UniProtKB/Swiss-Prot annotation:
This is UPF0324 membrane protein SpyM3_0740. The chain crosses the membrane at residues 7-24, 28-50, 57-79, 84-106, 118-140, 150-172, 256-275, 290-307, 314-336. It comes from Streptococcus pyogenes serotype M3 (strain ATCC BAA-595 / MGAS315). Keywords: Cell membrane, Membrane, Transmembrane, Transmembrane helix. One of its GO terms (cellular component) is plasma membrane. The keyword Transferase does not apply. It is found in: Cell membrane.
Amino acid sequence: MSTHLRKLPGLLLCLLLALPAWYLGRLFPIIGAPVFAILLGMLLALFYHHRDKTKEGISFTSKYILQTAVVLLGFGLNLTQVMAVGMQSLPIIISTIATALLVAYGLQKWLRLDVNTATLVGIGSSICGGSAIAATAPVIKAKDDEVAKAISVIFLFNMLAALLFPSLGQLLGLSNEGFAIFAGTAVNDTSSVTATATAWDALHHSNTLDGATIVKLTRTLAILPITLGLSLYRAKKEHDIVTEENFSLRKSFPRFILFFLLASLITTLMTSLGVSADSFHSLKTLSKFFIVMAMAAIGLNTNLVKLIKTGGQAILLGSICWVAITLVSLAMQLSLGIW
């Protein structure tokens, strides 16, 4: 059997799990399709032990379909629009990202949490949830159970943010503009930002959704420097251990991140030439679906019992990151005179 045909059974299995997960994600956007995909994968893994025929396809999906999803994610970024509208929120974005990364790095040893999970929780909390985790996992060579743990933590605090933040913003007296920045900087995943801003708009008959989404997209750009920095650090560390040869920047750069940037530049150029942003909608949708397929594969490679037993430290780290990001976002708004 050829290499491609050997991958087919595993690919089809991930596709079959992704379809109901996608549907459930549409019904319950506050949870999201990637979380349903991981759950379905983990539940099936409890009973599906003899997977010789599907092993290659599952591995291919969790790695290469995931990287393809990140590349396609670039077609959702119009850099001109993001830079024009998102610049006001840039100091807050930088502050919240730096806070989450410092908290994750500082508490990793104290919580006795593995480095990869702590890194994924910090990056997922500060940049763009599941998409940031999807982009970072291949760079740091994270194991599937580490990815599943981080995604689960992000989901928990996404849900809490969507439920609590509209009432919190009202209690604090945030303006519509202030809440758009708050939701865009303090909520992790795009779907949860949408849910949070929509709930605020329903309460106040306003339109914060567009502003919150653009702030969120501006945060997404941080994927580029963060993943590049991590890939260089990891490659240099591995190089120093293995060999004394000169370090190669070109070899250490993750190609799929380069293609992500290229996709963003293509989108920016085409829209500046008058092409409608809706033209890229199908590619953005395909990106989201590929992430769901990859999460199904990751779920299939994750031990649910082990995840439950060892997930406490990751949840604690996620909660501290979440509170820290929330406080810094509000404090920066106060210092900049937005709140």
